[in-house]
Amino acid sequence: MKYDTSDLCDIYHEEVNVVEPLFSNFGGRTSFGGKITTVKCFEDNGLLFDLLEENGLGRVLVVDGGGSVRRALINAELAELALKNEWEGIVVYGAVRQVDDLAELDIGIQAMAAIPVGAADEGVGESDIRVNFGGVTFFSGDHLYADNTGIILSEDPLDIE
């Protein structure tokens, strides 16, 4: 489904939180949305492999990487795994790499920056916890909508029709 965050903000201005404009689109899908699953991991993407193995239909993974742009948390392998398991998208408060490959995949991926250095894969981190970045607090189960203009968050799903 295609989302227009500007229209959604006009209609639901009282119900949505707007994430600060820190993110750029790196995936092949320019708009995406769904129920979020949160994860907090710093320069380590081992836990992301486990989470992206799950069925992602209607879901968006929100990754709090502490804002670090020294190591990329998402690479082509993880993005392909997410696509295979039908995730709608990934938002990374951190960096990605292999951006030409990411742009070819039909999945939404937004992040702060790109860097060629990969993350560790020790599996250090926590999932399904409250995370806060971009002026917004994210809880697993909230609903996120993203496009090239921005990212918005709602406690309940928005009536898009």
Curated annotation (Swiss-Prot):
GO terms for molecular function: endoribonuclease inhibitor activity; enzyme binding. Signal peptide: none annotated. Pfam families: RraA-like. Keywords: Cytoplasm. Transmembrane segments: none annotated. Its main location: cytoplasm. CDD domains: RraA_family. GO terms for cellular component: cytosol. It is found in: Cytoplasm. GO terms for biological process: negative regulation of RNA catabolic process. PANTHER family: 4-HYDROXY-4-METHYL-2-OXOGLUTARATE ALDOLASE 3-RELATED, REGULATOR OF RIBONUCLEASE ACTIVITY A. Homotrimer. Binds to both RNA-binding sites in the C-terminal region of Rne and to RhlB. Belongs to the RraA family. HAMAP family: RraA. Globally modulates RNA abundance by binding to RNase E (Rne) and regulating its endonucleolytic activity. Can modulate Rne action in a substrate-dependent manner by altering the composition of the degradosome. Modulates RNA-binding and helicase activities of the degradosome. This is Regulator of ribonuclease activity A. It comes from Yersinia pestis.
